[in-house]
Amino acid sequence: MALKSTNGTHAGPTASAASLASLAANISEKAASLSTYLESQGHAQPSFLPGCADPPETEEYLALHTSLTSSLEDLQRLVDGPRRSLRPFIMIGNDLAALQVAFDFGFFQLIPPEGSMDVETLAHKVGIDADRTARVLRMLATHRIFVEPKPGFFAHTAASAVFHDDEELRCAGHYMLDECFKAATACSDCIKASPNDSDSTHSPFNTYFGVPMFSYYEQNPQFAARFAKAMAVDRQIAELRDCFPWGDIKGTVVDVGGGSGHISMALARNFPKLDFIVQDDSEKMLAQGRARNLSDIEGRISFMKHSFFHPQPIGGAGAFFIRQCTHNWCDRDVVKILKSFVPGLENSAPGTPLLINDTVLPVPGSKPLHEERALRQMDMLMFVVLGAKQRTAKEFEALLKEADARYEIRRVHADGSMGLVEVHLNI
């Protein structure tokens, strides 16, 4: 079901046009289709119990998921009405406060993966009173994060068990509920203090903590280590591998701002004819890459200290690649980064691509609301922590033209959270 909103954008079943009955019918139909699909593919049915497997990431499943989620959200809002539907939104800080406590005091690790733990024992282990321990757990249990199988005893659910088992995801959650949650409370103060400036020194993070984010991590290595693990959550490369014809590249891929080189290593293992140079400004990150076991790709990957704010020294490349870097910087800095590639592209064969692998924001209303929301959450996160932003394809195009009028976007191979923008320099 796809209807038009009053402003003409695609909005799915809308509150002004969709009836409760039609939404409910669509939900029933899509839920049945989803269940049938899971069964046909040999997947277990969804469950709140620990050990429940994540659903598949196939195109078929995601299409059913998108349609079902859109209808579920709209039905919930229609049933609640405008006033009641706003209450959970404006009260969400209290839910997040409970989650913050659970992360800070290690609830997810201390409650055993099987069986349960009484609240008195947990409170004693973490060194706080049983009353607040229970209240936090009961708040989370309303989101099916933990369950109270009998009074005063708590056990894992499928959701809480994920935080118990997955250290990287737990670090991502802790990072969000510590640095980011705190910094977000300073958004309005930041804007009031600098109504026309937005960069790392004019960011809510800097307003709250008194230093830009990366300086904060230099001063607090224990939080820097957690941040690094949190960022590791986003290391899946299947979409990147499949959305671009890497096998057609002739020559060396220069991975700029590539950190320890984990993406280049993964691509090298998938495309045995490609070689890689990993560039980063951090000797520590480069050292981590060199220390990895590279025996299976020996001689095909090298490491080089280089800042993407300085002119690119490598010529004759097969491609230049920059992943998840532009969203960390304000527009004027991104222009500097894009300018830095020009010498390298000028000294490479005509048609050598610059591949920008970063979020590509959608045109408003062009995606289902829950998908657009997830992307705009990341855009707000970049504002909060770095005074930076995520960008649309048109915004990338404008910055590219400002950097060099010869830049041209040839194709956006993928959009959303793992966009890939192919850029050429017309020479």
UniProtKB/Swiss-Prot annotation:
SUPFAM superfamilies: S-adenosyl-L-methionine-dependent methyltransferases, Winged helix' DNA-binding domain. Keywords: Methyltransferase, S-adenosyl-L-methionine, Transferase. O-methyltransferase; part of the gene cluster that mediates the biosynthesis of the phytotoxin solanapyrone, a causal agent of early blight disease of potato and tomato. The prosolanapyrone synthase sol1 is a polyketide synthase that produces the octaketide desmethylprosolanapyrone I via sequential condensations of 7 malonyl-CoA units with one acetyl-CoA unit, and one methylation step. The octaketide backbone is further methylated by the sol2 O-methyltransferase to yield prosolanapyrone I. Prosolanapyrone I is hydroxylated to prosolanapyrone II by the cytochrome P450 monooxygenase sol6. GO terms for biological process: methylation; secondary metabolite biosynthetic process. Gene3D superfamilies: Vaccinia Virus protein VP39, Winged helix-like DNA-binding domain superfamily/Winged helix DNA-binding domain. It is an enzyme of class 2 (transferase). It comes from the Eukaryota. S-adenosyl-L-methionine binds at residue 281. Pathway: Phytotoxin biosynthesis. Its EC number is 2.1.1.-. The active site is at 327 (proton acceptor). This is O-methyltransferase sol2. Belongs to the class I-like SAM-binding methyltransferase superfamily. Cation-independent O-methyltransferase family. COMT subfamily.
